[in-house]
Amino acid sequence: MSTLFIADLHLSVQEPAITAGFLHFIQREAIHADALYILGDLFESWIGDDDPEPLYRQVAAALKSLQQQGVPCYFIHGNRDFLLGKRFAEESGMVLLPEENVVELYGRKILILHGDTLCTDDTDYQHFRKKVHNPLIQKLFLWIPLRLRLRIAAYMRNKSQQNNSGKSERIMDVNSKAVIDAFLRHDVSWMIHGHTHRPAIHSVELPMVTAHRVVLGAWHVEGSMVKVTADNVELITFPF
C-alpha cells in the first residue's frame, strides 16, 4: 500500500516527452497506488477550463481512467495553473483541495501544499500572487476572449522568466520561519511540497520534535515522486 505525490510537471505542447513520461507514470506507477496527489504546476500555464487544447483532453482522460480504476486523484493549485477549475476537475475526476491541506496516511499527519506561499522572501512574487488570487481579477480575466488570454499568458510567462533571472537563489527558496510557522500552525511533523525544483528531504527542529520537509523535484529530464507507505517516506527519481 502506498500513496504517491508529484508536482511541477509543467506539461505543455512544447515538451511532448514529459507528457509521454506522465502518461507512462499513470500506467506504470499510479495505477498501483492508494491515491495520487498532484501538488500544483501540473501544467506550464492554465488560462481557463474552456481552452480546447488537445493536450488537456489527453491528460484529463488519463486521470479519469485512473479514478475509474479505483485510484482517487487530488489536486492543489500551483503558481502556473491556479485557474484550473471545477469543469476540468470534473472532466479529469480530480478532487480540488485547499492551498494547504493535512492528510493522514498510515499513521502520519502530513501537510501538503504547492510551496510558493513558503517563499516569503520573494516579496515581488508574493504581491503578484495576492493580486492574481483575487476572485474578482480572476473572474475578469476569464471573461476575456480566449485568444487574448493566450497572449496575456505568454507575456506574463516571459516577464516572469526575466524577473527570476535577476533574483538570487536564496530569495526564490523557502523562508525558514515560514516553514516552521506552517508546521506549528497545522500541528504536523511532515510536510510535502514542490515549487522550488530543489528535491531533498530536510530535517527541521521544532519544539520537542524533529520534523521533515520533503521537496519534490520538477519533471525536466526525469520524473520525481514521493512515495509514502506505512514504513517509509521516499523521494524517488525515475526515467520517463
Curated annotation (Swiss-Prot):
It catalyses: UDP-2-N,3-O-bis[(3R)-3-hydroxytetradecanoyl]-alpha-D-glucosamine + H2O = 2-N,3-O-bis[(3R)-3-hydroxytetradecanoyl]-alpha-D-glucosaminyl 1-phosphate + UMP + 2 H(+). InterPro entries: Calcineurin-like_PHP_ApaH, LpxH-like, Metallo-depent_PP-like, UDP-diacylglucosamine_Hdrlase. Binds 2 Mn(2+) ions per subunit in a binuclear metal center. The gene is lpxH. Mn(2+) 1 binds at D8, H10, D41, H197. Substrate binds at N79, R80, D122, S160, N164, K167, H195. Its cofactor is Mn(2+). GO terms for biological process: lipid A biosynthetic process. Mn(2+) 2 binds at D41, N79, H114, H195. This is UDP-2,3-diacylglucosamine hydrolase. Belongs to the LpxH family.
